[in-house]
Amino acid sequence: MGSTLPTTYKRAFFEKQDATLTLEEVQLIEPQRGEILVKVEACGVCHSDHFAQMNLMGGGFPRVPGHEVVGRVAAVGDGETYWKIGDRTGAGWHGGHDGTCGACKKGLFQMCDNEQVNGITRDGGYAEYVLIRSEAAVRIPDHVNAAKYAPMLCAGVTVFNSIRQMNIPVGETVVIQGLGGLGHLALQYANRFGYRVVALSRGAQKEEFARKLGAHVYIDTSKEDPVAALQKLGGAALIVSTAPSPELINPLIEGLGVLGKLLILSIVGGIEVHTGLLVSERRIAIHRTNSIVRSLLTNSKVGKGKSIWSWPSGHATDSEEAIAFAELQGIDCLVEEFPLEKCNEAFGRSSSTTADRERVFLADFTGLTTTAAMMDGSVRFRAVITME
């Protein structure tokens, strides 16, 4: 490696399952063939970083989390021809692919049978330096703010890519459930895509904020029935679930119109789906026998063709397109910055459930005052760890 690089660097890692993050200084490792070494400028904190803490994907320990990385190439592995020292680059959830499986042959690299995941199965960006697979690295414009664009590599590309993959015609009604890290970006992307955007959340205090982000309609679920409200609008062509609320899944299905799609992007855990709601034109009676949910259809009419979808983030090109679209359309990711030394505080933001820990300052965004923007409830934005 070049003489300008340090011999050691700081990183935050999980030593064992369910542990807090530990800071340490370790030897800098040279990139191998197919890898680039990146000096980290910023790394977003995502709820999925808990997968590393709990070893849910078998990545093992010790593990450095973080898959929303922006930085610059500091060194390249042997034979590297695409990336050069000094290039602005980044890393998202997708950390590498084999290029030979069925998904890869279709260009769906983030669905690779042998996919690597940054910060989960390989070390991530809670560090001053990180090794990234060359084929999974994302080209980042030189002029963009690292902290604001780091979350685009997961939250941003997830909502951008999944919504566009649903192939909803322009002008249709698209509902965004939840106003957190994913939801506040989904509102903006859906608005710029040309949809009639409906924000679905609890609390009247969030309406102004939702409309500033691009919602044309706001439904306060604490005051009105979301199903009735959505059906009054003609039913949704697409509902994007960005908040983990299992009890809302079936009501959301009822809020869909003909051929409507429910896109689940949040981690909701185990849910029971009333399948009759997907095919029946009326409410159905649900009976439970031996823990098996059985749907009794109340009529024999042809169903409405409703469906439930998911979409796994995106690969490097998807991320580059999400960033380019965000720049073109003025989409803004709202973040709260932390130094690496406060990594545990930043990590706590991704799982906090109390109002105090979910408050962030948004005084400079769209004219909202600090008081109005420090909203109680389930509004949650992106914590970002920044390096000196």
Swiss-Prot record:
Pfam family, one: ADH_zinc_N
BP terms from Gene Ontology: patulin biosynthetic process
Disulfide bonds: none
Entry binding sites for substrate: 67
Cofactor comment: Binds 2 Zn(2+) ions per subunit.
Binding residues annotated for Zn(2+) 1, in chain numbering: 46, 67-68
Principal cellular location given in the protein's record: cytoplasm
Any one Gene Ontology molecular-function term assigned to this protein's record: metal ion binding
Cofactor: Zn(2+)
Localization per Swiss-Prot or TrEMBL: Cytoplasm, Cytosol
Record: residues binding Zn(2+) 2: 101, 104, 112
Function of the molecule: Alcohol dehydrogenase; part of the gene cluster that mediates the biosynthesis of patulin, an acetate-derived tetraketide mycotoxin produced by several fungal species that shows antimicrobial properties against several bacteria. PatD catalyzes the conversion of neopatulin into E-ascladiol. The pathway begins with the synthesis of 6-methylsalicylic acid by the polyketide synthase (PKS) patK via condensation of acetate and malonate units. The 6-methylsalicylic acid decarboxylase patG then catalyzes the decarboxylation of 6-methylsalicylic acid to yield m-cresol (also known as 3-methylphenol).
UniProt family annotation: Belongs to the zinc-containing alcohol dehydrogenase family.
Protein name in UniProt: Alcohol dehydrogenase patD
Gene encoding the protein: patD
